[in-house]
């Protein structure tokens, strides 16, 4: 059974790690101490080269704790303008790390990335977060314009989850 942590009585897990991997591990380990079976922790975000990797692990809180996706995008575009990196082509990547744990033991961490560029205007309304300004390599559309099926095939999270699924298959079936 798959459950969202928000649907449990587990206390909020503080993301105080210094990397996506640390945060994913913190989440998975903490939740696995309260829930039976295999538990997955996830952390992900956008890294923009012109901003030395920002927003990075602060992607969700980049424009403030309760900021909307639009406010996060606006802040990112302002920061790019501030450092003179305007235009349609700043190199960036989405990175996701998923960690697998059970009964307080870490079973593995798996990373997925998708390289691309940041556009200077939001395009599309699919997805969430920074999707409307990220164009993955090999495409002209932003994540906000791509179908869910295409995005899941190439996305950072899809890649990380597929790597994790291979590990779970080995644990469960000895493959």
Where are these regions (language model features)?
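Anionic-ligand binding patches
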Residues: 1-175
């Amino acid at each position: 059974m798959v459950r969202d942590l928000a649907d449990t009585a587990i206390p909020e897990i503080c993301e105080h790690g210094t990397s996506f991997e640390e945060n994913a591990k913190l989440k998975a380990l903490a939740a696995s101490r309260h829930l039976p079976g295999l538990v997955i922790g996830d952390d992900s975000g956008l890294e923009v080269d012109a901003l030395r990797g920002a927003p990075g692990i602060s992607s969700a809180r980049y424009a403030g704790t309760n900021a909307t996706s639009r406010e996060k995008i606006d802040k990112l575009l302002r920061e790019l303008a501030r450092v003179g990196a305007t235009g349609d082509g700043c190199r960036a990547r989405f990175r996701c790390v998923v960690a697998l744990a059970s009964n307080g033991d870490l079973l593995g961490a798996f990373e997925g990335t998708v390289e691309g560029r940041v556009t200077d205007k939001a395009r599309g309304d699919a997805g969430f977060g920074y999707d409307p300004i990220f164009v993955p390599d090999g495409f002209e559309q932003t994540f906000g314009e791509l179908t869910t099926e295409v995005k899941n095939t190439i996305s950072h999270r899809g890649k990380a989850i597929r790597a994790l699924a291979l590990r779970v298959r080995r644990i469960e079936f000895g493959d």
